[in-house]
Curated annotation (Swiss-Prot):
It comes from the Viruses. It is an enzyme of class 3 (hydrolase). Trimer of three subunits that form a toroid, with a tapered channel passing through the middle. Keywords: Exonuclease, Hydrolase, Magnesium, Metal-binding, Nuclease. Pfam families: YqaJ. Mg(2+) binds at residues 119, 129. The gene is exo. Facilitates phage DNA recombination through the double-strand break repair (DSBR) and single-strand annealing pathways. Also important for the late, rolling-circle mode of lambda DNA replication. Gene3D superfamilies: 3.90.320.10. This is Exonuclease.
Amino acid sequence: MTPDIILQRTGIDVRAVEQGDDAWHKLRLGVITASEVHNVIAKPRSGKKWPDMKMSYFHTLLAEVCTGVAPEVNAKALAWGKQYENDARTLFEFTSGVNVTESPIIYRDESMRTACSPDGLCSDGNGLELKCPFTSRDFMKFRLGGFEAIKSAYMAQVQYSMWVTRKNAWYFANYDPRMKREGLHYVVIERDEKYMASFDEIVPEFIEKMDEALAEIGFVFGEQWR
């Protein structure tokens, strides 16, 4: 997936985009992204009816295609994370010994239906997801709990990022600037084929349902960028 194709389809030069800016939000419109994929793979408690969180995300993506507008998110926790992300990345590079290249958005293929926004692509071939927890309690939970303490939504995010990029491993790091020392902790998450099989099955079904719903109201995917 080349920058030229993205430019041709969206009018946006991805090489000039930074995570979090207006162009970045526009590139994600109607696209199933890593941070939200836990909604797509959410399973019903019984029967086949989609859970509320899956249905809600479905309607959100449809609205983004039809309006070309993303819902506003102004959470304090997001602002906190953004504020310390560069410090976290620098400390991670120093601690791990790998070089990190920023990458605003990566699409799985030319359909542009699925994408992830890594916090970095590492010189050893792995990806990087950085979290700067809003509370030190959450940092402590991960610091002591490791893999077991990673939220299911975050695990889905990392596994989906590997599905999109076809990488085999991903660093998952937490940074807390309030810690007097030992403020960075990370683990390496390996590609899990169970997740891959789940994405292979559920994501195309979800996209098909999106296209059916869009057709019903007279829209097609891609109109969000016109």
